[in-house]
Amino acid sequence: MNLGEKLAEGKTKIVYAHPTDPTLAIIVHKDGISAGDGARRHTIPGKGALSGRTTANVFTMLNRAGVATHFVAAPEPSVMVVYRCAMIPLEVVNRRIATGSYIRRNPDVAEGTRFDPPLLEFFLKDDARHDPQMTPDEIIAQGIASADEVEQMASESRRVFLLIEEAWAAQDVVLCDLKIEFGRDTSGRLLVADVIDNDSWRIWPGGVKERMLDKQVYRNMPVVTDEGLEQVRRLYEEVAQRTDAWVNQ
């Protein structure tokens, strides 16, 4: 499809202006995968289309549930049309199961501890500083978001988590945690934005960590081989296929 000017490019996607509508943008998913704030980077042919397919499925489900997201359409597997947003530089994380960075930061908490309700955390998007955690008061004081926006991000992120958790639970998959982002559209409305794909969560079939289907498999590899990358591609394909069921019921 036709693209406008390039607005931004990250490790896994490129954002373009819409060629005719200034309220829209176009996201093109790349085949890149990275970990460690970009210290480890590889290319997996076809990953962009699989990530785009998963993201489109997730956002379609959320839109149907009445969540305000930036997603408009996915004309191609690796392409999304979205409402153009000024992104808020925060990762909003909800955790059901203690694992990953949480237990490294909180060694007194046993891995597998269940949080009910889900535990909410905010992180500043800053690779150079390794995405430092922020409190709501710090976010407000630094002018990153208003108090009302922080409250809205907290409530909407939990709603999104619970919807996705329920969808995964129907397939006997435990959603351990979920990272999402928000942006303001051209009218100032706060929307769930960016992408939600297999890089955004930890998912354990049957609640068994060793059966994980997500990006953590790539993070955990001591050495990345072509065979390892193919294993990761197959996992992303499985997740895309599984999320197809969320919108094709």
From Swiss-Prot:
Reaction(s) this enzyme catalyzes, per UniProt: 5-amino-1-(5-phospho-D-ribosyl)imidazole-4-carboxylate + L-aspartate + ATP = (2S)-2-[5-amino-1-(5-phospho-beta-D-ribosyl)imidazole-4-carboxamido]succinate + ADP + phosphate + 2 H(+)
Sorted alphabetically, the keyword list is: ATP-binding, Ligase, Nucleotide-binding, Purine biosynthesis
Which PROSITE patterns does this one have? SAICAR_SYNTHETASE_2
Residues crossing the lipid bilayer are none
Q: Where is the signal peptide?
A: none
An example GO BP is: 'de novo' IMP biosynthetic process
Q: Which Pfam families match?
A: SAICAR_synt (PF01259)
Disulfide pairs? Answer: none
EC number(s) given by UniProt: 6.3.2.6
Protein's pathway: Purine metabolism; IMP biosynthesis via de novo pathway; 5-amino-1-(5-phospho-D-ribosyl)imidazole-4-carboxamide from 5-amino-1-(5-phospho-D-ribosyl)imidazole-4-carboxylate: step 1/2
Q: Which GO terms describe its molecular function?
A: ATP binding; phosphoribosylaminoimidazolesuccinocarboxamide synthase activity
Spell out the CDD domains in the cross-references. Answer: SAICAR_synt_Ade5 (cd01416)
Is Membrane given among the entry's keywords? Answer: no
Give the record's family classification: Belongs to the SAICAR synthetase family.
Spell out the protein name for this chain. Phosphoribosylaminoimidazole-succinocarboxamide synthase
UniProt organism field? Roseiflexus sp. (strain RS-1)
**Lineage, uppermost ranks:** Bacteria, Bacillati, Chloroflexota, Chloroflexia, Chloroflexales
Which gene does this sequence derive from? purC
